[in-house]
Swiss-Prot record:
Keywords: Nucleus, Ribosome biogenesis, RNA-binding, rRNA processing, rRNA-binding. One of its GO terms (cellular component) is nucleolus. Residues 1-51, 77-97 are annotated as: Disordered. PROSITE patterns: BRIX. One of its GO terms (biological process) is maturation of 5.8S rRNA. Residues 297-314 are annotated as: RNA-binding. This is Ribosome production factor 1. Residues 136-319 form the Brix domain. May be required for ribosome biogenesis. Residues 1-10, 82-91 have a biased composition (Basic and acidic residues). InterPro entries: Brix (IPR007109), IMP4/RPF1 (IPR044281).
Length: 343
């Protein structure tokens, strides 16, 4: 058949092109509306991982995040308006859930008013210290042939523990060191272990009858490595703060740390040593108070700082062969829940 020529053919061609454009626009609009429906109305069992196209999956993920953020913002504004409208009658703000306040209850949690606890404290190994019958005298030593950071860390520890002496081991076993410490009236033995010139362990032995605690040490920061540090610590006796040692085991560890420092701190020196237990990690900090006015006070860290994790608690003095252990950390058996702590 012969094709039509002239103005009628041109008219028909324009009409066809116009209809095609309208169809494509309608198709795009339909596709966009479908996309919005997919973003806003996903089936309940739908998972973004089911989308095979990576770009499409990322796009959908971003959209979902944005929508959730908008919903949270709207809900927050609504609650704020309700609280402002109620004024003093508004209910108290809900306490946010944390691992600490969701902690699994431990049966060995210590009650300070318990008579049995008071009797144990009056007869345990630390009773002479708390009854002021003995004065702390500490011997700080290291593993054989210490190097680098371990040496500097040991020296800085002696500067923040009053009445402490540093002696480097020369191949002498701990079993031989302990009787010598007892004969020279030392009340505690502190041993810094190292691996590849880095401190990685701490053994604390209370003398003469124990107990002995073994800690993993990490995150050691010496004074030189700290920012905005204060001047060198003075010889004043510091205050000691023990936080969150709530269980029977934690109570024993807290008393062990307290027995390192002498009684009657010198408040003139404004120095404080803090042992803060959080999720079975013991954070040590050494600060100085800065009194800005009669009502305002600040703190300035002096260093060093480090973190301890209890590995074992042994009855009596150090004995790796025949020692009786009160508590040993068994990771695969004990760390079954993130909300269960031992200290």
């Amino acid at each position: 058949m012969a094709e039509k020529k002239g103005p009628e053919a041109k008219k028909q061609k324009k009409m066809k092109n116009k209809s095609k454009v309208e169809e494509t626009d309608a198709g795009e609009e339909a596709g966009a509306s479908e996309e919005q429906q997919q973003v806003t109305r996903l089936p309940p069992a739908f998972s973004l991982s089911e989308i095979k196209n990576k770009q499409r999956r990322q796009f959908m993920f971003i959209k979902l995040k944005q929508e959730k953020r908008k919903e949270k913002l709207i809900l927050r504004k609504k609650r704020k308006k309700e609280r402002e409208a109620l004024g003093d009658k508004a209910p108290p703000k809900p306490v946010p859930k944390t691992i600490e306040n969701q902690r699994v209850y431990d049966e060995t949690t210590v009650d300070p008013a318990d008579e049995e606890v008071a009797l144990d404290e009056a007869t345990d190994e630390f009773a002479p210290y708390f009854n002021k019958q003995t004065t702390p005298k500490i011997l700080i030593t290291t593993s054989d042939r210490p190097r680098g950071r371990s040496v500097r860390f040991t020296e800085q520890l002696s500067s923040i523990i009053p009445n402490s002496d540093v002696y480097y081991r020369r191949g002498l076993a701990l079993k031989k060191i302990i009787p010598q410490c007892v004969s020279r009236d030392y009340t505690d033995l502190l041993v810094i272990n190292e691996d590849r010139k880095v401190p990685n362990g701490l053994v604390l032995c209370h003398l003469p009858d124990g107990p002995t605690a073994h800690f993993k040490i990490s995150n050691v920061r010496l004074r030189k490595e700290m920012k905005r540090k204060g001047k060198e610590p003075t010889e004043h006796k510091p205050e000691v703060i023990l936080n969150n040692f709530t269980t029977r085991l934690g109570h024993s560890i807290g008393r062990m740390f307290a027995s390192l420092y002498p009684h009657d701190p010198h408040f003139v020196g404004r120095q404080v040593a803090t042992f803060h237990n959080q999720r079975d990690y013991i954070f040590f900090r050494y600060h100085r108070y800065l009194f800005k006015s009669e009502k305002k006070v600040g703190i300035q860290e002096l260093g060093p700082r480090f973190t301890l994790k209890l590995r074992s608690l042994q009855k009596g003095t150090f004995d790796s062969k025949y020692g009786e252990y009160e508590w040993v950390h068994k990771r695969h058996e004990m760390d079954t829940s993130r909300r269960k702590f031992h200290l």
